[in-house]
Amino acid sequence: MTPVLYYLPPSPPCRSVLLLAKMIGVELELKALNVMEGEQLKPDFVELNPQHCIPTLDDHGLVLWESRVILAYLVSAYGKDENLYPKDFRSRAIVDQRLHFDLGTLYQRVVDYYFPTIQLGAHLDQTKKAKLAEALGWFEAMLKQYQWSAANHFTIADIALCVTVSQIEAFQFDLHPYPRVRAWLQKCKDELQGHGYKEINETGAETLAGLFRSKLKQ
């Protein structure tokens, strides 16, 4: 039985899971949920995932949500390249730290700044813009450490962070103050180009950015 992924194509967390699945050759049964119309609140989905969020993975009865957990699970269960999520606990801890930085800081500040406009048509908050710039500055400093975000090789942290930063880029946030971030992002794009980057991530990022721009004009 093929693992089932409940998702929405433009969602950044969903895109990261789709990119990894493509990279490691995992076939997923895709079930789209339109969260803008409340499809995630249907009783059968709430029964599956009480938090009723996407992405949600159902792999033979093992139900997981939170995209970064799903990334780690898919590599552990199906991946052949140990480098994507190292087994060495010290190396893995760095990958985990970057994933948590993405979840709790960088991506969260993207959501805080842009999503009130996307969802409610609210005006942009300059304080939240400054907080996003601050998080990008921290990431810029982190990139001094390794050739990639968490190691001297590509990991699942790069996938998660690439989706976040490419979405920031699609929103036309000024990335010029962050040369390491820009160079790293281009490396990620090159690495993922043969794994559906354009159709999965670039298209989704532009869809979400287009929705943002349309709300901004209202």
Curated annotation (Swiss-Prot):
A GO MF annotation of the entry reads: glutathione transferase activity
In this entry, which stretches build a coiled coil?
none
Among Gene3D superfamilies, the record links this protein to: 1.20.1050.10, Glutaredoxin (3.40.30.10)
Q: Name one Pfam family in it.
A: GST_N
Q: Name one GO cellular component term.
A: extracellular region
Q: Which branch of life, at top level? A: Eukaryota
InterPro entries (UniProt xref):
Glutathione-S-Trfase_C-like (IPR010987), Glutathione-S-Trfase_C_sf (IPR036282), Glutathione_S-Trfase (IPR040079), Glutathione_S-Trfase_N (IPR004045), Thioredoxin-like_sf (IPR036249)
Catalysed reactions, as listed in the record? RX + glutathione = an S-substituted glutathione + a halide anion + H(+)
**Record keyword Transferase present:** yes
EC assignment: 2.5.1.18
- BP GO annotations: glutathione metabolic process
- Name the keywords, alphabetized: Transferase
* SUPFAM superfamilies noted in UniProt: GST C-terminal domain-like, Thioredoxin-like
The family assignment reads: Belongs to the GST superfamily. Theta family.
**How does this protein assemble?**
Homodimer.
Function, please? Answer: Conjugation of reduced glutathione to a wide number of exogenous and endogenous hydrophobic electrophiles.
Recorded hits in PANTHER family, A to Z, give:
GLUTATHIONE S TRANSFERASE D10, ISOFORM A-RELATED, GLUTATHIONE S TRANSFERASE D11, ISOFORM B
Q: What is this protein called?
A: Glutathione S-transferase D7
Which organism is this entry from? Anopheles gambiae (African malaria mosquito)
